[in-house]
Amino acid sequence: MIGQNRTFVIGLDLDNTIINYGSLFYDVALENKWIPTECQKDKIGVREYLQAKGRNDLWTELQGLIYGPYLTEVVPYSGVDDFLLECRKLKIPVWIISHKTRFPAVGFQYDLHASASAWLFASGLIHDETGGVNKDRIIFCETRSEKIAAISRLQLTHFVDDLPEVFLDAGFPKETTRYLYAPEGIQFQHTYFESITSWKD
């Protein structure tokens, strides 16, 4: 993705793009006895199980727990730090633009923006340099429309996200090169974006 072109301005999603939740959704849901042990051990499996049982309320509450008090238990995907280091070396600015409400819709009202910011600073990914991510290049958006508007306003040359629907939104800027992050190796063929399976791609 990175070349010698220093006119790049790169944008990254946060959840499931930078942050690797692993089996945390499964672990916390199981701890609360919301799912059986045989449930698929990832975010999608837990979500599909709860929604199939008509318990979208538990799914929403689970997200609040994961993105709030349990966020300290997650780590970045392998290669994220190397990617951002390369951006710092090349003086390529990187923005983190996350679609994340400030408070959960149900359950305890954790400040999810504060939790995510604290995690980012604790992760060592934020540096006060021209390239890479600094404290002034982190944006939390309450809606997908706000997120896409921010991508457009900042005139990002590239954006990485784990959700195809972001790239397929009619408002997504056509000038921005789109990379779908699919670490599970699932390849999505589409003319609007390119799939990558690791940060080394």
Identify the residue ranges that each predicted region occupies.
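Short catalytic/ligand-binding loop motif for oxyanion handling, primarily in non-cytosolic enzymes
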Residues: I19-Y21, F103-G107, K147-A149, F167-D169, ...
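Metal-dependent phosphoesterase signature
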Residues: P36, K43-L85
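Structural recognition of alpha->loop->beta junctions
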Residues: A116-I139, Y192-D201
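Donor nucleotide-activated moiety binding/catalytic core segment of transferases
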Residues: G131-Q155
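A structural signal for isolated positions on well-ordered beta-strands in alpha/beta enzyme cores
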Residues: P93-W95, R137, H158, Y179
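Asp-based, Mg2+/Mn2+-dependent phosphohydrolase catalytic module
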Residues: M1, S152-R153, H158-F159, L163-D201
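Active-site neighborhood of HAD-like aspartate-dependent phosphohydrolases
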Residues: M1-L58
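Substrate-recognition element of Asp-dependent hydrolases with the DxDx(T/V) motif
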Residues: L71, V80-L120, C141
